[in-house]
Amino acid sequence: MWQSVGLTVLVIVATLICVLLFMLFGWYVVWQLFLSKFKFLRELVGDTGSPQAETEPSESESERSSPPTPRQRPKTARQRVIPPDSTT
């Protein structure tokens, strides 16, 4: 009687451990292949030491080193909005 109960408990515990390990391994693989590419998710997890985070240049460095793209190109005098002088 007690042997069958013990064996049943052992099977249930072993099954739960196997399922938990399988889920953790799956999350690790998904993180490495897909989720770690998103900066927002890395910030949520607090992952600042990843190689990808270190190799990505900051915005100020990339703006200085790269030529201006059409979005970053300075506006011409006609396109600029000049604020009215408050001294007059």
Curated annotation (Swiss-Prot):
Region entry Disordered, spans: 48-88
Top-level division of the source organism's lineage: Eukaryota
Transmembrane segments: 10-30
Keyword terms of this UniProt record: Membrane, Transmembrane, Transmembrane helix
UniProt KW Transmembrane keyword: yes
Family annotation (PANTHER family): SMALL INTEGRAL MEMBRANE PROTEIN 13 (PTHR36877:SF1)
Pfam families: DUF4750
Recorded family membership: Belongs to the SMIM13 family.
Cell location: Membrane
UniProt name for this protein: Small integral membrane protein 13
Membrane topology: Single-pass membrane protein
Coiled-coil regions, chain positions: none
GO annotation, cellular component aspect: membrane
